[in-house]
Structure formats: C-alpha cells, structure tokens
Amino acid sequence: MNEQQRLASRQANSSTKKEEKDYSKYFESVYQPPSLKLAKKRGKEEVKIERDFGLPEEFRDFGAGRKFYIRTYGCQMNEHDTEVMAGIFTTLGYEPTFSTEEADVILLNTCAIRENAENKVFGELGHLKSLKRRNPDLIIGVCGCMSQEESVVNKIMQKNQHVDMVFGTHNIHRLPYILKDAMFSKETVVEVWSKEGDVIENLPKVRRGDIKAWVNIMYGCDKFCTYCIVPYTRGKERSRRPEDIIKEIRHLAANGYKEITLLGQNVNAYGKDFEDIQYGLGDLMDELRKIDIARIRFTTSHPRDFDDHLIDVLGKGGNLVEHIHLPVQSGSTDMLKIMARKYSREHYLELVRKIKETIPNAVLTTDIIVGFPNETDEQFEETMSLYREVGFDTAFTFIYSPREGTPAAKMQDNVPMEVKKERLQRLNTLVNEYGVNKNKRYIGQIVEVLVEGESKNNPEVLAGYTRTNKLVNFVASKSLIGQLVKVKITEAKTWSLNGELVKEPIEVK
C-alpha cells in the first residue's frame, strides 16, 4: 500500500460515520507496526466508562436463521473475550454451532504470545480456504491479539484474501458494525485500533458452563518485559471500577456460580490508574470475601506489584483460595534484568517467604522461559535451583519464542536450539518430579472438590478441582456435577489425583 492509498484509506474511515461517537481518534493505519517508541506513549487521557451498550434498531434480528462459530487460541482473557463475542452474536439473533461446515460466520480469536500459536492460526486459515470456495457467502474473521500486529495483517491481506474481516482487542464491542461492513463489502474489512478504547460495561456474554466464571477486573499491561508482545496488543493498564466488578460477581453468585477467576494481564496493578481513590487488588479481594460464593482466585500476577496488603488479605482465607500463580520466568537476576522484569531473584524469594509465612498451606505455581537470548549454563542452573528452593507444585515451561516488535527480538541469540531443548527437558524432568512428590502428600487426606463434569478419559468418572487447583478424579453420581464434595485421596499422579467420595455436597457458608 503506497502513501496515497494510505491517506485515502484514512479519509474513507473518517468520513464513514455509523454512530454519533467519533472513533477516528482511536484509529491509525494497520500498516504502522508496534514499537516501543509508540507503544510506550501511554497517554494521560482519561479512560471513560461506558455502561450503555446497546444495538440500534437496524441490527434487530440481523442474524436470524444464521449460525456462528468461534475458535479460541491462547489465554483465559481470550476465552472470556470469546464469551463476550458469543453474547453479541446471540443478541444479533445468531445461533452457535460447533461445525465450521454449518457456520455462516467463522471467527478465529487469536493469540500472539508465541510463534507456535500464530502458525496454528495461519494453518487453520489455509484449511478454511476450500470451505470459502464451496460457500462464497461464508464470512471469515480474524480477531484477538494477532490482529494488533502489522506484519500479521499484511500477511492476511497478501496471502489470505478469503478472510473477510480483521479487528483487534480494543473494539470487540464494534463487532456488529464490522460484521455488517464485511457482509456488504467486496474487500477485506480491517478495523484495528492502535489506541485502546474505553472500558465498556454491560456487554452481553454467553458463559461456558454455569459452575465457574471469568470476570475481567482490568485490561492491558504497562510492564514492557522485553520478550512480551502483550503491552502492544492489549494496550495500557485500565481498571474496571470496583462497584462494577462487585455487582457482576454478586449477580454470578445469585445465579449459582461456585467459583470466580479474576482476570487481567497484570492483576496486581489493579487500581493503580485510579485518580480519585486509593484502591488496589487487596482492597477488592477484601470486599469480595463478603460475597456468598465458594471460591475466588485470580490470574495473572506480576511479582513486582504483589504487595503486603494483598498477602495479608489472602491470609484471611474464607472464599479466597490458597493457590497463587506467580510467574518468575528465570531464577537469574541477570536474566531478569535483561527481560526487564524489574525484580531480582532475592526479591522474588522474599515475596515467596512472606506468602508462605502468612498462608502456610499456599500452593505456588509459575511460568518459566528457557533459552532466552544469551542465557548461560550458570544462569539456567540458577533457575533450576530457584525452582527447588521455592518448591513449586508445577510450572508452565517454554522455550523462548521471539516476537517481532519487541526488544528481545533484536537481541543476538547465541544459544543453540539443541541446548534450549536440552534445558527444557531437564527443567520438565524437575517439574514432573516435584509435581508427583507434592501430589503424594495428599494421599490419605480429605479435600474439598468442586465437581465440574465427567473425566475426559472416562465418562464413568467425575472430575473436579481442589481449592489449590489440583485435578481430582473419582467415581460418583453425575448428580453431583456443580457441587462441592469431600473426597479422600487414594492415589497421586504427576498431573492429577484419584480419590473416593466420602461426603455428600457441602453447604458453603
């Protein structure tokens, strides 16, 4: 696209006014790549809260007789975004389907955190090309974090011209308008906002199940770890107002939900953007303790922002679970500095000490990257020793995956792939060893299990999770699905526990 075409594109976008609100201030050419210089310009503009989401009359029964299909890649935030998009589709009159062959609209909600995730999406787009040939009226869309990357949008425009629409993470609430444009346009409709939008409340949702629910408490991230694309794809940190969060969770509790997971790219930064009140995650958790719901947990944490007040509140127990996922990424202070994690090995270990002192039965899990540019054998050994010192129950482990547009992608990488794979294998051996040994401690214990459904491996067996997020399998009546029960653990495996039902459903007070 040349400069003249770019200017024409901007003029076309700014002159097309479908609503009274002017969205042009948010929109920049999708051909502008993410960069630290631009992405770090966290403007001081006030983030507005909009609570009046609604659809104009033109969209009444817009999807009547049509079906939609959404495939989701990546984290819980993407899963929750899919729930919102499903809610919007349903409000438009569409019906869900689990078959791409039956769908009138197919959306791929994408993840940009690792190269493997992107490869899966482009592979799926290739498979959908033949379906589009057979059904030219099919609408295919790409949304989520990949859409925020200039190189991805270019690749879609050049090599995947059967894609009808592309939109990003900041304008999901604009789905009806984007969809309408895609249906009547001969060209691919691209609406990617490089500036994050306002916080939109009261969006419709179709939740997965009626036992556990995700609740966003904030959006975006301002940490700019050198390997991470999220600050570019999700924008600056924006917190929802506590009253809106509390209202949503009270509503879920009243509708029978047993467990809530609070979501954010960095939940520990919650409230730091408020200018009118001093209110953080610890304050929010303290208020949520008073709600009549069995369990509340949160993800994802950043050690830098995990403060003493939050630890003290979590120590009060009640419906606040004893499981904390605390990504460390590396056990080497030098590596952490290059990663721009803004804490040291010593700081992390001191944080763990405080957590264990206040919450003696706390279960800690983590994320670890191996093979970061220029990681030495000694630095990797520091990660191994930290894992042992903390005594994690388990970890999500990854070989470093460079993301275009991040500082780490420009670093010289002198760690051979065979060395990276060997380190990952050694780390996973340690993770598995600790996992099974930690689980063996549960043998003979009676634990509280929230029954979620049938086991994936055996429909005659029920499966659920403990407060510390341990998977438990046991034989019992399917009438217990959705209930809290007591189970005696009889066998420990690396990733799960087996047990026997010892008590009927518990009443949670």
From Swiss-Prot:
Gene3D superfamilies documented for this protein: Methylthiotransferase, N-terminal domain, tm_1862 like domain
Cofactor note: Binds 2 [4Fe-4S] clusters. One cluster is coordinated with 3 cysteines and an exchangeable S-adenosyl-L-methionine.
Binding site residues for [4Fe-4S] cluster 2: C221, C225, C228
Domain MTTase N-terminal: 66-184
UniProt entry tagged with the keyword Iron: yes
Domain Radical SAM core, first and last residues per copy: 207-437
NCBIfam families: miaB-methiolase, MiaB/RimO family radical SAM methylthiotransferase
Extent of Basic and acidic residues compositional bias: 16-25
PANTHER family: CDK5 REGULATORY SUBUNIT-ASSOCIATED PROTEIN 1 (PTHR43020), MITOCHONDRIAL TRNA METHYLTHIOTRANSFERASE CDK5RAP1 (PTHR43020:SF2)
The protein, known as: tRNA-2-methylthio-N(6)-dimethylallyladenosine synthase
Similarity comment: Belongs to the methylthiotransferase family. MiaB subfamily.
EC number: 2.8.4.3
Origin species: Bacillus mycoides (strain KBAB4)
Recorded superkingdom: Bacteria
Alphabetical UniProt keywords: 4Fe-4S, Cytoplasm, Iron, Iron-sulfur, Metal-binding, S-adenosyl-L-methionine, Transferase, tRNA processing
Domain TRAM: 440-503
Cofactor: [4Fe-4S] cluster
